[in-house]
Amino acid sequence: MSKGYYSILFSQTTTNLGFSLYTMVVISFLFKMTNSTTIASMVTLISIIFRIFGSAILPLITIRLKLPLTIIISQLIQMLLLICLFYALLRTYSNQTLILVFIIISCISFFNGWFSPLKSAIIGEIISPDRRVKANGLLSTVDQTFQFVGWSLGGLIIAFLGEGYTIILTIFLLFTSLLSLLFCLPHGHANSVIREKNSPNKSIVSGWRYLFSQKKLRTIIIMDLIESWAGMIWIGSVSLAFVNEVLHKGESWWGFINGAYYLGSMIGGFIIYKLSERFQNKLINFMLIGAVSYGSLTLIYGFISNSYLALILVLFMGPAYILRDLTQETLIQNITTEQTRINIMSARSSLVQFIFMFSILAIGAISDFLGVRLVYVSAGILLLVSAIYGFSQLQFKKKVNKHISF
């Protein structure tokens, strides 16, 4: 792997670790300040909305700036905004302070929405197609490991250091991420291709048009959208409700369930990294296997009440999810070109987060009126529908067309 790849790997790790701490700090601070669960929970919704906006306008930036420079600028601005947030946390409570905190959160989320599509586009440009499965597998393994550490130990870190010093730790993590990008990322390579000089409107629309113009890409995106509706099952409030109401366990088991899922994801990413050569030439097959496995396990999980069996199922869900997710990511990187990749990644990120936002809003009603068990059952059905659709479009039609050609 190139030096630029390890720069992205280190940057993603420190950024996501920092933002797991940042999210917990902000939610904890707002809850203590207002004693309102509703206001604290608004952090997630506002973050998603502004990440959508950030991803949507990213093509306007990348027609003028190289991808490495864009990702460096986004990290620098987020670091400066975190410094502003640190000073906001020191202020005494007032409505003005509350508004200021939410403005800073919105701005941070806007620029944070650039990171994922930029990362995927840069990996697609600096890594050759025959090594992308391995590259994405290692990225996922390291990322899941440090997110697990962040979310597991975040509460202890905040309790020990306090909100202010935890934000300082987050700023330090983003600073190290920025240094890695500055000194290791090959600024002259990525985004070196000649791009069409489109108008701002065309630059934004082109990504959305590309999403549905190529058959394989269109199928993967539609699968993505269906799966996004099912993504709400791992929202903290939903998984905690399932543990309490269905498994009849407390918060400790909620931690075990979350830990098992992250552990499974780490194992899945490591397996894909080690066996990348076997996956590389059969991406569609393994994507569909992962989709069917994840959907089936989720559906079964929705019907059970045994906590130990639930733990085992969640442990296996992790590798199934990672298998589906990494093969989808690699397929998109392989299908797209350097001229279109960032526009497609930006449009995809915006669309998936938009659907996910609505699934969050819908999940409360489903859970309250029909019960949290049905949430997981319906999610499992949606995931299987996505897998069946993918099989019908990518495998069945291919076999039919081959048969007709003879």
UniProtKB/Swiss-Prot annotation:
Example GO biological process: response to antibiotic
One MF annotation (Gene Ontology) recorded for this entry: efflux transmembrane transporter activity
One Pfam entry name: MFS_1
Highest taxon listed in the record's lineage: Bacteria
Keywords on record: Cell membrane, Membrane, Transmembrane, Transmembrane helix, Transport
Transmembrane segment boundaries: 7-27, 43-63, 69-89, 98-118, 155-175, 220-240, 253-273, 297-317, 352-372, 374-394
Any one of the GO CC terms: plasma membrane
Compartment list: Cell membrane
Topology with respect to the bilayer: Multi-pass membrane protein
Family recorded in the similarity comment: Belongs to the major facilitator superfamily.
Protein name in UniProt: Uncharacterized MFS-type transporter YfmI
Species this chain originates from: Bacillus subtilis (strain 168)
